[in-house]
Amino acid sequence: MIIHGFCTGTRHKHKLRKTFIMLGAGLGLFFSVNQNSFANGENYFKLRADSKLINNNIAQDRLFYTLKTGESVAQLSKSQGISVPVIWSLNKHLYSSESEMMKASPGQQIILPLKKLSAEYSTLPILGTAPVVAAADVAGHTKKMSQDTTKSNTSDDKALNYAAQQAASLGSQLQSRSLNGDYAKDTALSMAGNQASSQMQAWLQHYGTAEVNLQSGNNFDGSSLDFLLPFYDTENMLAFGQVGARYIDSRFTANLGAGQRFFLPENMLGYNVFIDQDFSGNNTRLGIGGEYWRDYFKSSVNGYFRMSGWHESYNKKDYDERPANGFDIRFNGYLPSYPALGGKLMYEQYYGDNVALFNADKLYSNPGAVTVGVNYTPIPLVTMGIDYRHGTGNENDLLYSMQFHYQFDKPWSQQIEPQYVNELRTLSGSRYDLVQRNNNIILDYKKQDILSMNIPHNINGTEHSTHKIQLIVKSKYGLERIVWDDSTLRTQGGQIQHSERKAHNDYQAILPAYVQGGSNVYKVTRRAYDRNGNSSNNVQLTITVLSNGQVVDKVGITNFTADKTSAKADNSDTITYTATVKKNGVAQANVPVSFNIVSGTATLSAKSANTNSSGKATVTLKSDKPGQVVVSAKTAEMTSALNANAVIFVDQTKASITEIKVDKTIATADNKDTIEYTVKVMKGGNPISGQKVTFSKDFGTLNKTEATTDQNGYATVKLSSGTPGKAIVSAKVSEVNTEVKAATVEFFAPLSIDGNKVTVIGTGVTGSLPKNWLQYGQVKLQATGGNGKYTWKSSNTKIASVDNSGVITLNEKGSATITVVSGDNQSATYTINTPDNIIIAVDKINRMAYSEAESRCQAISSNLAQSKSVLENIYSKWGAANKYPYYSSSNSLTAWIKQSTSDSASGVSNTYDLVTTNSLTNVKATDKNAFAVCVK
């Protein structure tokens, strides 16, 4: 039996000691009086259990005999009729050779077969009585008693004799000590406990090996019990069962297994099968293992296979759990020259995405660990060890241990003598050792789908259009908020915002302007958060902006580009155009696309082409005349064609402009914002430096009309304007008389918000924002400039929210900044300052008595209106309350007014209606006549 990790607390220590002593006393009485019930006809069981001369020197039908003066092994062999080979077979682990055993001197120990000596020892006297003088028998032992005397030793006599002995001993101690009654009681109980322990040991030694680990703290968490029971045992084969139970990490786990061990002259091979059951977490696992042992060496391999699937975790919130599949390989070795010193090596590996190999708070994918350790056994009873484990994630454990290895089949003297450590390391000494395996179930975890979100459809729409976003949100604890990252969309003037309902999952997308030649595809991400702070995965929404000529929700061209900007005007060099056709963001195959030359002289390879499996249709263009060409593409469902950027066919024998580009197509008409034009001049396929380029425009102001190319053949100019309008810039070189035109650009007036043109929705009055607010009252801002297509956002929607038309709803007292972005990517802001007061209707459905209304206002750090004039002022600034969506269902919003001293004495008050302006006096305060309308 191995007992390790045993500790006790100081609390209830006295009660625990008494409990164990009383239990021991009862067991002692049971075994002392009923010891003969264990007799089975074998001589061993007939020995007196209270004869310490025998009990301390016998084990498993063997006598551990100490040679006396003048005795030798040869004499014992002759006098007892035991052959020397039989004696040598029992003493191989004590002596290096048979000759060394024969030389054993007085004081040394020899193991003899107990059954051969049963006649001499079955009638030994009880310790404490007068011994019979030995004659011609083993020295130090008694002679046979007479037959009559033997017959008188019945079980009742033995019990009475033992009781008399212990009573005499107790009386002697009481005579020699002046102690209280507790000492007498404890001494008596201790004697009975010792007897129980002795009898229990004699009984348990026939039932295998037990390992106990008790932790008295933390409700015995960490405690375990394992028991190996041989049920068929021969010299060459052992069949056994093993049971175990443990309470670790607040989980109760049981293990049930069976196996066989086959013993060869120098080694052992074995196998075992286990079922592990976690009763707390309802997890089941199968274990299959193999063993190979030799003297001073043990090895084992174990495989672990789950038998239960995913289910809610027993002690890890918001997770599911199941056993992890895995294996381990273990090696234990000891030095034959110094068997007290041993080493350990183990590798373990488990499989799963979130396996808790180390603890439930540290989860790893397919983790593994290597354990190395050393141990020291100074005497068979005690083993001390230190293990170091290193595993996945750079996890490290350093474990110290001390084990107490109590063997029921060995006398106490053998368990505290260093010379007997060697036997533990042999096959015969470890025959009944427990299976080396991991009895704890290693678990694999999976985060529950407590919060998930998805968008079933991406968005495709024309520039500046508004689209409702369909969100599907599943939340275990309720949705708190959704956070969007629409930065890429905002840079072009679009945004994601709440729709008018302002529910947690009610959003809409406002698309930016279409960028000619750009990708016009935006990736927007969002993440949901629940009321417990959990977050969902990032979900991506793809928004595709189409030009006004394209058709949403129909088969249309989303992109039309050329593979190069110029080609030789030799009627051979070609430019390839690719049109991409999609419907709702999905590529469409087998769709006819028609192509047409909008301007210039050139030849298309085909007037139409069908899209391939990727939704792409291609056509080539060639020309034998220098000049600029524009090509368009269209599907049958499109209302207008989509133009590609202009391309240029050049005469390579002359210096020619091969491309003209702009850095942007829109700018602010403030004489500061500029658009940069870049042209490239080449001749014979090489860039030309020092070439003069002449620029012209039909609108705006160029910073210069001539520019010279650099070493790479580039020349640049800039265009600005102080007035809104569209402009086309052209360029030409002296060797080619034809102008090359750039894409059309547009200048927009500077964007601004006039703070003196704030319109109150309920009255239609335009001016500055009133300093006293009606909660959920609305005003409309007016933006001017830009391209006239605006998107709005608020810095703090809890204070003030804004819709896509610039209508602001005042939600709470405070300040916020409203930003408007135009389609040409200009922005302007308007700051809402904290008002002097805000009128809040705490409850617009249920009328209440004056005192209740006053309490409701105080609960939100506000008060009832001090006078009717306060409410009249609100009405004059905001109009009837029911002109706003929040109050639209209210035909009346009668508000209590703060009582005067005389009103309070009379139990009355005044009211004012924010819908009808009806004013009443001397209204009975105890009746539910008005609403709780508060001033904050």
UniProtKB/Swiss-Prot annotation:
Residues 780-831 form the BIG2 domain. Residues 63-112 form the LysM domain. It holds the Pfam family Intimin_C. The keyword Transport does not apply. Keywords: Cell outer membrane, Disulfide bond, Membrane, Repeat, Signal, Virulence. Gene3D superfamilies: 2.60.40.1080, Immunoglobulins, Inverse autotransporter, beta-domain, Mannose-Binding Protein A, subunit A. Disulfide bonds join C857-C934. NCBIfam families: intimin_all (NF033627). This is Intimin. The gene is eae.
